[in-house]
Amino acid sequence: MTTASCFAAHASDSPLVPHQVTRRVPGTNDVHIDIEFCGVCHTDIHYAHNDWGRTVYPIVPGHEIVGTVRALGSSVKDLHIGQRVAVGCFVDSCHHCSSCDNDMEQYCLSGFTPTYNGSSADEGCVTYGGYSKNIVVDRHFVLKVPENLDPAGAAPLLCAGITTYSPLKHWGVKAGMTVGVIGLGGLGHMGIKFARAMGARTVMITNSAHKAADAKRLGADDVLLFTDQAAVAKQAGQFDFLLNTIPSPHDVTSYMNLLKIDGTMCIVGSIGPTSELNSRPLIFGRRSIAGSLVGGIKETQEMLDFCGQHQIVSDIEIIKMQDINHAYERMQASDVKYRFVIDIGQSLS
């Protein structure tokens, strides 16, 4: 066992403070990673504050991890010491259910093991995430980071990136299609970048007129102000696919008339109950509402390679580990464009 400096929350109403956790000695299939950067996700805040009622304290958040290989288990032959690698939202799964057999570990029928606040099958203990100096992970769940990507900007790709890439890829977004990205935040800004890189006409859909300029800077071909009823009416039936990144409950069916016949809106932002469903725009257009989590390991590697080919990273603000509590406050006030990334290498010793 080795120790790792980290920051942890010890109660729902306490700030994150310096802490230490133990990491297992790398096994034959393990990779020991020195963490350079870790993105900050809204999920981190939810777990730190026990918003979902299942946090195990102390908790060390962080599932957008980029670092370099410190040590390798004897069976790991395709990585080398010093290589830049990444770890995303989960570090284990059952490996044998139909989902895992089809490279969709995120939908493991036994439940995947989250990178933090999960139960390690091998050790029977709680997993600790990337707000930490180092981590030990099974090779299967370690990803290769293209050499041309900025490592800090690449960190949010492990959650915000794959959360938006996976549904766009699954629903076949390509040139000749029109895609609407609803909401401009950590997820929405990645949705714009990916949809545009896939060749689709990309429209940012927002209630905030002041976000229009930034949406176009990120690559949006157009901006639809959803509070402009006349403009919305003109766009009815024009979209092949809607990527809904709004993080809070809302009337999802209010957007459905924007879709073409057989169009799909995929929800990736808001988890849990929402307003009552009006089925009329679905039935009178054979439209669909769907949801998507993150991607499996194979697809996440594909996404990273796609980002390398298209020079895609997240728009970020780098912070020190010691500033994490203030960063949480700013995130809750929507005061970041568009993801915070912790410089672990320069913050923890």
Question: What residue ranges belong to the model's regions?
Answer:
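Adenosine-nucleotide cofactor-binding segment
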Residues: 175-184, 196-254
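Glycine-rich beta-strand-centered segment in the early N-terminal region that forms part
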Residues: 24-38, 51-101, 106, 128, ...
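NAD(P)H dinucleotide-binding glycine-rich loop of Rossmann-like/cofactor-binding domains
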Residues: 94-182
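Short glycine-centered segments of the SAM/dcSAM-binding site in methyltransferase folds
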Residues: 84, 178, 263-264, 288
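N-terminal Rossmann-fold NAD(P) dinucleotide-binding loop
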Residues: 188-189
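Rossmann-fold dehydrogenase core element
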Residues: 264-266, 277-317
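Helix-to-beta-strand junctions that scaffold the AdoMet/dcAdoMet cofactor pocket
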Residues: 259-260
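C-terminal hydrophobic helical "lid"/dimerization subdomain
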Residues: 2-4, 253, 297-349
